[in-house]
Amino acid sequence: MRNDREVACDTSVLKMLEEDDYADYGNTLINFAEKISLTPFPFAAGLGGNMKQMKRRIINIVSYEKPTFIKRVKGMTAFMLTAVLLLGFAPFISTYAADGSHYQWDSSSENISYVDLSTYFGEYEGSFVLYDLENDAWSIHDMEHATLRVAPNSTYKIYDALFGLEEGVITPENSFIAWNGETYPFEAWNADQTLQSAMNSSVNWYFQAVDEQLGASDVYSYVQEIGYGNENMSGDFSSYWMESSLEISPIEQVELLTKLQNNSFGFAPENINAVKDAICLSASDAGTFYGKTGTGRVDGQDVNGWFIGYIETADNTYFFATNIGADSDATGGNATEITMSILSDMNIWVSQK
């Protein structure tokens, strides 16, 4: 690296000299090298480098030719093209490669339709992701937010329940956990719970109790096994999924739901079915609707709303994830309203009155 800098400096000097002065400049370096070599510690001061480096500099001087006008134009053109390319790619580099908060999704082989659904989102930032299983096709609103990882909040309970079932902390036949008597802000939480009731009312303490019996090590092993988002559980063990360290993107939510639906995890079928039953919101002749909301609260404000799930019809299965963000009022309930409007207008699901 240092020798390259010295050669570059020599070249800069030669550009300013007349051709007749090249030899004098080279002789100056040779004389300097000769004097330095006679000292007890040649090149100890680092001036000029070692003899091999000095030889390279002399060869550069001997072979130097001033660039012609055409060469200068070509050089400048190459420089400008390189600069333009670097500047053009800079936003992508800074946003995706250097930004660990985005899911690095290889979408090159995916069938994707980019849809503008901004009228549904209003003032909210966020994304809607839909995967059509039968046609192997994606519909995505706002790709940047579709790959942005944020806290899953209560949507994570789908998988936390599955971990507890797999380890026998709860079972499909007996998922009862007694209320400890502590008073919580929601009346439904102040009672004994089963998986069904805890999922319906999104009872935090139930899933925290499951985690406590599992232990952090086992939970982390499962998070890694299924590839849940950024797999980061460095936050407090009682709240790592609530606006803390664990984060996931809408696209990853949909990918995990497809694995849950067809049990790509290879878990016990009865445990998969127990979770599916717990998140089943509606069943009719039109199909079966599964879903889970999530709301992230920071400093008393709801800033992160989720609604994820899938719809099984007679001839297809659709997986979806909606995430909204704002300084306030970004709730799972509002994410649900947005989702249902989109699904209805897409003729995928019409809410039963």
Show where each model-derived region lies.
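Hydrophobic topogenic segments
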Residues: 1-99
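Short alpha-helical scaffolding segments that buttress acidic/His motifs in well-ordered protein cores
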Residues: 25-33, 199, 206, 210, ...
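Structured C-terminal helix/loop/strand segments within mature extracytoplasmic catalytic/sensor domains
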Residues: 94-122, 212-215, 258-284, 296-353
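Short pre-catalytic segments that frame enzyme active sites
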Residues: 95-154, 168
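Active-site SXXK
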Residues: 150-174, 198, 320
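Short, well-structured active-site flanking segments
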Residues: 165-182, 268-272
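Acidic helix-start/capping segments at beta-turn-to-alpha-helix junctions
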Residues: 175-191, 197-203, 214-215
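Mid-domain, small-residue-enriched loop/turn segments at the edges of structured enzyme/sensor domains
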Residues: 194-195, 209-258
